[in-house]
Amino acid sequence: MPGCPPVIHYCTFCQIVARQEPADVVYEDEEVVVFRNRLRWVPVMLLVVPRRHVTQEELWRDMGRVGEVAVQMGLTHCPRGFRVVSNFGFDAMQSQEHGHVHVLGGTFLGEYA
């Protein structure tokens, strides 16, 4: 798999990037893949992931292209407003080790989403 480490443990996002797991991909380029989250708490729930396997901390130290694409996807899919968020660790309900950001929108989000 280009960009992902040798398989030590299973990484769903590495599998999606490699097209070995199904996903509703809405955008991709050389560095980033964007797909719809299978969970749907709000109308638009996109996951923006780097092709290269990195941790959340590594991703946020150098947001670069992932940040640019997250904002672009938010503006495209949620023109009335959106949130870009990440979960760090168990208490924040981070379920994937592969660094990623969520783009949430498509409705009034209220104080918390």
Predicted features and spans:
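HIT superfamily nucleotide-processing domains
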Residues: M1-A113
